[in-house]
C-alpha cells in the first residue's frame, strides 16, 4: 500500500484561522482537524481493529488514516480510488469478521457510491489491482409513481445512499433513490433478492421514497434470530423493520424524515432504535422500542421456500400491526434547544452505555448527550460547512 499525495488533505491546529468559527463547550477541546479543501467528507468509520479512520469523500475517494498518533504522522494515510469514479462515496462499512475474529487477511470494506456502484475493497492489498475485489452496478428500477421513462433513454443508474453488512459477514444490503433494497451474498457477490413495497393502496409494506439509512440489527452478532433483521429509514417519513429473506417490510414507525446514513441506529442491549429527523421538529432525537413481538408473530407465520420466507394467504397477521399503541410512538424524545437555535438532524449515534451523539445542519452542531438525564454534556457549535455524518 503506497502513500498518496499529501496535498489531498491538510492538518489544521485549533488555533488556525479556519477553525475560528467553531465554538467548543468548556469541557471539550480539539487536537487537530483534517481539511480536504473543496472536497467534503461524506462518511467516517473506524476499521474493525480500530487502526484506521476510513473516510468517504465527495469525489469518490476513500481515505484511510492511521489512528495511532495521527497528529504526529501527517503523511500516514492511504487512498482507495476506482478508475473513473468521481461521484460521492455516500456510505461505507468495514465488513464484520466471521465469529468476531479479526484476521490480517480479511480487511474488507463495503463502499457505495451515488454513481450506482457498490464496491468491495481489500484495503491491505499491495497494489491497486489487488485492493478492488468486486464492483456491482445497480440500474434504477421504475416505480408506479415515477414519471414515464423515454424508450430511447439510456439505462439510468440507481443512486446508492446507504449500505449495511450482516453481522455474520455473509450478506449485505444497499438502499438508494429507487426505493428498492438489494440483498447480496458477500462471498459470491450475487444478488439474492430485491425487497420493496407492494406499491398498493391497501397497505404500506416498504418505502415509497428514497432510502437514506440501512442498519443490520447488532444482536445478529450473537443471536441467530436477529442475523437476518435490519432497519431502514428514508424520505417517506418512516422507519421500517425487515427480514432479508422476505420481500416486504414487517413493521413501520411513522414520523422521522431520515436524510443521512448516520441518522438511524439500534442499540443491542436495550433493543432501542435511535433516529434523527431532518426537519425543524420539536425534538432532535427520537427513541423507539424495537418490536420483538412482531418477530415472534412473523417466525410463527412464515414458511421457508429455499432461502426465502413467505407468508401463506390468510395468515398475514404481521400486517395487522398488533400492539400499535405501544410501538407507534417514541418511548423518549430529546427536544430542540431554544438557545442553540433549531437544527435538522443528520446524525444519531449510541455511544456506549452512557452517551448519545447528535449532529445536525442549520445550527451546524455536534452534541454529546447523557442517556440517563437526556441533558447535553458537551457540544461543538457553528461547525464550518454542513454537518452530515460521523
Where are these regions (language model features)?
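WD40-repeat beta-propeller superdomains and closely related acidic/aromatic-rich repeat-like regions
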Residues: 1-390
Amino acid at each position: 500500500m503506497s502513500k498518496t499525495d499529501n496535498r489531498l488533505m491538510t492538518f489544521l491546529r485549533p488555533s488556525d484561522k479556519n477553525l475560528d468559527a467553531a465554538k467548543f463547550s468548556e469541557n471539550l477541546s480539539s487536537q487537530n482537524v483534517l481539511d480536504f479543501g473543496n472536497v467534503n467528507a461524506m462518511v467516517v468509520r473506524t476499521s474493525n481493529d480500530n487502526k484506521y479512520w476510513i473516510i468517504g469523500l465527495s469525489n469518490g475517494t476513500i481515505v484511510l488514516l492511521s489512528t495511532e498518533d495521527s497528529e504526529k504522522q501527517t503523511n500516514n494515510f492511504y487512498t482507495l480510488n476506482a478508475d473513473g469514479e468521481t461521484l460521492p462515496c455516500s456510505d461505507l462499512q468495514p465488513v464484520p469478521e466471521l465469529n468476531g475474529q479479526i484476521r490480517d487477511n480479511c480487511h474488507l470494506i463495503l463502499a457505495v457510491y451515488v454513481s450506482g456502484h457498490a464496491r468491495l475493497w481489500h484495503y491491505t492489498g499491495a497494489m491497486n489491482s489487488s485492493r478492488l475485489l468486486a464492483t456491482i452496478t445497480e440500474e434504477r428500477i421504475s416505480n408506479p409513481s415515477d414519471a414515464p421513462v423515454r424508450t430511447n433513454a439510456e439505462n439510468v443508474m440507481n443512486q446508492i445512499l446507504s449500505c449495511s453488512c450482516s453481522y455474520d459477514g455473509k450478506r449485505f444490503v444497499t438502499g438508494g433513490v429507487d426505493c428498492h433494497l438489494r440483498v447480496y451474498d458477500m462471498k459470491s457477490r450475487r444478488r439474492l433478492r430485491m425487497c420493496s413495497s407492494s406499491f398498493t393502496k391497501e397497505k404500506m409494506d416498504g418505502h415509497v421514497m428514497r432510502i437514506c439509512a440501512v442498519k443490520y440489527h447488532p444482536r445478529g452478532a450473537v443471536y441467530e434470530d436477529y442475523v437476518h433483521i435490519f432497519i431502514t429509514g428514508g424520505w417517506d417519513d418512516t422507519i421500517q423493520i425487515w427480514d432479508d429473506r422476505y420481500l416486504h417490510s414487517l413493521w413501520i414507525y411513522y414520523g422521522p424524515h431520515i436524510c443521512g446514513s448516520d441518522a438511524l441506529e439500534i442499540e443491542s442491549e436495550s433493543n432501542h432504535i435511535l433516529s434523527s429527523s431532518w426537519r425543524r421538529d420539536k425534538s432532535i432525537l427520537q427513541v423507539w422500542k424495537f418490536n420483538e413481538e412482531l418477530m415472534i408473530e412473523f417466525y410463527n407465520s412464515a414458511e421457508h421456500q429455499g432461502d426465502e420466507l413467505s407468508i401463506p394467504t390468510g395468515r398475514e397477521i404481521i400486517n395487522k400491526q398488533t400492539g400499535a399503541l405501544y410501538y407507534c410512538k417514541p418511548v423518549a424524545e430529546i427536544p430542540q434547544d431554544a438557545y442553540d437555535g433549531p437544527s435538522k438532524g443528520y446524525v444519531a449515534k449510541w455511544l456506549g452505555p452512557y452517551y448519545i451523539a447528535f449532529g445536525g445542519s442549520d445550527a451546524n452542531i455536534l452534541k454529546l448527550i447523557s442517556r440517563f438525564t437526556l441533558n447535553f454534556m458537551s457540544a461543538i457549535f457553528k461547525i464550518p460547512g454542513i454537518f452530515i455524518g460521523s
